[in-house]
Amino acid sequence: MDRFSDELSASFPLTELAPSAARHWLSARAALPVGVHDRVVLLLSELVANSVRHSGLAAPEEVEVEVHKIPGGLYVEVVDHGVGIGDPVPFKPDHFGLRFVDTQSDRWGFRNDPTRVWFEVDGGSR
């Protein structure tokens, strides 16, 4: 994790390209152990995709990403200024959603106004 000091941040236009752009952005800037890297990149991609699908917004609006080193791991936050998170939706085979975040992160949560979903991944692989 030594290619950045304590935090990274970026914004991506709310288009179908945003999840891929966020994955490439993080991979290019954070040297993470393989197991941690894969989990963090997949979780980030899913949350950015959720912003694209569910925020009710489109480009030129943006989704914001922040990554912070914390003792023993990483804290990642994805923010959009969309409609917020309501009741959970039924499982759909083509959408992993917050269930994926719940199973693959070590801790996670959300707040609305603006919509802010965060997760933490500990330094070792899960």
Task: Identify the function of each model-found stretch.
Residues A21-S45:
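Conserved short strand/loop->alpha-helix "switch" segment adjacent to the catalytic nucleotide/phosphoryl-transfer site
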Residues R39-L57:
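Histidine-centered phosphotransfer motif of kinases
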Residues M1-S9, V52-R126:
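Conserved beta-strand-loop-beta-strand hairpin that lines the nucleotide-binding pocket
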Residues P19, R23, E120-D122:
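Residue-level detection of beta-strand scaffold positions
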Residues E7-P19:
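STAS-typified acidic loop motif
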